[in-house]
Amino acid sequence: MEIIESDVVIIGGGPAGCTCALYTSRSNLKTVILDKNPSVGALAITHQIANYPGVPVDISGEKLLTLMREQAVQYGTDYRRAQVFGIDASGEWKTVYTPEGTFKAKALVLASGAMGRPASFKGEADFLGKGVSYCATCDGAFYKNREVAVVGVNKEAIEEATVLTKFASTVHWITSSDPKSDNEEAMELMDNSNIKHWSRTRLLAVSYTHLTLPTMIGV
């Protein structure tokens, strides 16, 4: 099996990994990126980005990530498609094991992303980045004068729904239980004219045409 030595090995080819590689490569450090799949990850699956500084036109996440990767490679980064199955970081030289070869480096950077949460309803993975979003601050402007749904009764869901009321014509707030009456933020949200509250309800699925919202009985 091939053994490749370098100064830095970066696991993950997303924006964090590519940014790190750009800096290390420009510092004349021999750098290798090991990327399982350039088509997955939070940025790669994002359908449209309109708030990235320095990019004046809407761009897909996949295209933006390609530009980041190409810039790192331009300065000497060795980009490789590889699935990491083992790491030994106990010694001075860090060792990373893949089916394609063994990589040794004095520095190891883990930039494997944060897409570990499993889908919670049918269609979530299919529409992620194409209508399903986890960031109202990032994507709220896309939903101006449109109907949008927010699922959840926790603090984060309340904050996201509140942000979306500034853009959407109607925000369908879907909660599996009734908000606590002493939660001032929740009560203010329910008083908002743009909010339609679906209490004791859970989201089963999404499709191109509708949401499936069965009312939960006795929950």
How should these model regions be labeled?
Residues 210-219:
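Single conserved hydrophobic/aromatic residue that forms the stacking wall/gate
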Residues 53-69, 178-182:
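Short beta-strand to alpha-helix junction loop
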Residues 4-5, 10-36, 128, 134-183:
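Rossmann-like dinucleotide/flavin-binding elements
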Residues 1-11, 27, 79-145:
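FAD-binding core/adjacent interface of flavoenzyme oxidoreductases
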Residues 69-90, 95-96, 102-103, 166-211:
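A Rossmann-like FAD-binding core segment of flavoenzymes
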Residues 37-60:
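Conserved N-terminal glycine-rich FAD pyrophosphate-binding loop of Rossmann-like flavoproteins
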Residues 48-53, 151, 189-193:
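Short, hinge-like loop/turn segments at secondary-structure boundaries
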